[in-house]
């Protein structure tokens, strides 16, 4: 079955796996998903991920989820910009999540990065998701 929102599908898989206290979750691979997973890993929301490549050019990521005292590190992960309604933000209008305790992942001309890195680089872009 075709997925209309691949990034939203990955975020939903992560959210559902953490609610079920799974250690790992598989998701189809893409460059955008890899960049978002890189940001989640560098910000400490996931342990890491590995890539599996199949002969037909298809890739799959296995994401290692992170828990602290038995509770998921990611309390909330939510898609902001969707295929039907794109959301863009200038650097001065970049939304803060939980007064700076969470992050917003932004796709900018300089790459996919967390909101604080986008402010530091003085670039705006498409607001992909919020993580808290």
Curated annotation (Swiss-Prot):
Give disulfide pairs as residue numbers.
Answer: none
Give UniProt keywords alphabetically. Ribonucleoprotein, Ribosomal protein, RNA-binding, rRNA-binding
Under Gene3D superfamilies, the record lists: 3.30.1370.30, 3.30.1490.10
Pfam families associated with the record: Ribosomal_S8 (PF00410)
Listed GO MF terms: rRNA binding; structural constituent of ribosome
One GO biological-process annotation of the entry reads: translation
Cellular component terms, GO, for this chain's entry? ribonucleoprotein complex; ribosome
InterPro entries per record = Ribosomal_uS8, Ribosomal_uS8_CS, Ribosomal_uS8_sf
Q: Which domain of life is it from?
A: Bacteria
What does the UniProt record say this protein does?
A: One of the primary rRNA binding proteins, it binds directly to 16S rRNA central domain where it helps coordinate assembly of the platform of the 30S subunit.
**HAMAP family in the record, alphabetically?**
Ribosomal_uS8_B (MF_01302_B)
Give the family this protein belongs to, as stated in its UniProt record. Belongs to the universal ribosomal protein uS8 family.
| Quaternary state and interactors | Part of the 30S ribosomal subunit. Contacts proteins S5 and S12.
Protein known as: Small ribosomal subunit protein uS8
